[in-house]
Amino acid sequence: MPVVIGVDSSTQSTKVELRDLDSGELVSTGRAAHPDTGAAPLSETNPTEWLKAFDTALESATANKTQTKFAAISVAGQQHGLVTLDRENNVVRNAKLWNDTQSAPDAQWCIDQRGAAWWAEHVGSVPVASFTVTKLSWIKRLEPQNWSRTTRVCLPHDYLLWQLRGGGTKEMTTDRGDASGTGYWSAKTNEYDYEVLEIVDSNRDWSTTLPRVASPLEQTGTWRDAVIGCGTGDNMAGALGIGLQPGDVAISLGTSGTVYAVSATPTNDPSAAVAGFADATGAYLPLVCTLNATKVFDKFASVLNCDLQQFGELALGSECGAKDLVLLPYLDGERTPNLPNARANLVGLNSNHTRNDVARAAIEGVVCGLLDGLTAINKCGVNTNGRVFLLGGGAQSKAVCQITADLINREVYVLNEPEIVALGAARQAAATLTGKWPSWRATSKIAAQPISTATQSTATRERFAAARFKNFGV
């Protein structure tokens, strides 16, 4: 039985799925944790840890399966991370990850050089601290010795696939989806923007520094006789796993929050809210990302001295709007809106509020921020009137599903697959081998329908926006 392997190399762990090539049936899974990445605003790790985790996860997935034939493999990785390699192909320093916001001053410096509208027009996005281009600037500015040693840079999924191909002198490749999150590759032109890169360092030969961008179904090498796909970013793989169609919306609640939709044309948003990403098929994936999602639920469950299930039950015991209590959930700064130094605010608390209201306000604060992102995507001309899918750990919560349905005033779907990113990577592996996308994908079910009125949901979202503007001016 030919098997394809989908790998999800995320911030916290590596997940591996083995699936039947023809049916997509799940054969087995494996998982391995990554080391802690440090305290905000720093988030770094040694890239070699990803390879170790992959080996461990694969060993778990293939235990007692000696007859399994691997046909193809592909990797989806956390976006935006910066891996630096020297002339001998050794790691120069720990990789700076997407949620490392130390480069916030560099993001502003980059914008100041040309202006937000210029950046949006050139690369589809305005730099924020998460983007790779700002991390390049940070290392050049604060670690000149490391910068001078660096001869190649790549993204996390690029590094892992390069190692699977044998590392060393093997070619480094990336894909258009993950490349579009760097801040120096244009989804509109399908090329690196060297004018952008020269803002960071005009003396470097960038043509030899960056990975080649592979086409969506290109075979980029072999591993144990299995074809290697080009890989992609985690959000792009999520869209593949769902089989996202025009009009559909995906809202992912993990450590970070994302909302995205597919588009036939590239987008650019000078306000910096919407990142004009490419997807993994040849189309586009406008996306909004927030830094604070399920960790807000974890924190407030701890504050309220309850577990996550009890936290959800508390939230459902309150009403839509949490009796006018608003949480601005920026625990460790925020990416959208761009507030890297912000901290969370609980606005409007009075003696009549209960634990139920605090729990509800926490969930509503996270969801309101993501729905504001959906509005921004819609303003870019993208159709968002289709199905609404909730993904990630937050989607396992009945309260999160119900509150999202209430605030968006639409039914919401959840997927019947727990590892949608790994599934998407497996679909890409299968398509790379056969030359066409497989018919198998995640199935879904309706998780919640709105029970609050449109008036209540509108008022709740307007209170959130007003509190944000009053406290942060955005």
Language-model region placement:
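ATP-dependent carbohydrate kinase catalytic cores
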Residues: S180-T281, K398-A399, T404
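Active-site nucleophile and cofactor-binding loops and adjacent substrate-binding regions
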Residues: T45, A72-G77, K96-N99, V123-F131, ...
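Conserved phosphate-binding loops in N-terminal lobes of ATP-dependent enzymes
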Residues: K15, L58-A61, K65-A72, L136-S137, ...
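N-terminal phosphate-binding loop and adjacent alpha-helix
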Residues: T29-T68
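Phosphate/pyrophosphate-binding loops at sites that engage ATP/ADP/AMP, CoA/4′-phosphopantetheine
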Residues: F54-A71, L142-W147, Y194-D205, G373-G386
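Glycine/Thr-rich phosphate-binding loops that ligate phosphate moieties of nucleotide
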Residues: M1-G30, G38, V75-Q108, D112, ...
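Short glycine-aspartate micro-motif
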Residues: P2-D8, V16, F70-V75, V153, ...
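Gly/Ser/Thr-rich active-site cleft segment
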Residues: S9-T11, A120-G233, P329, A359
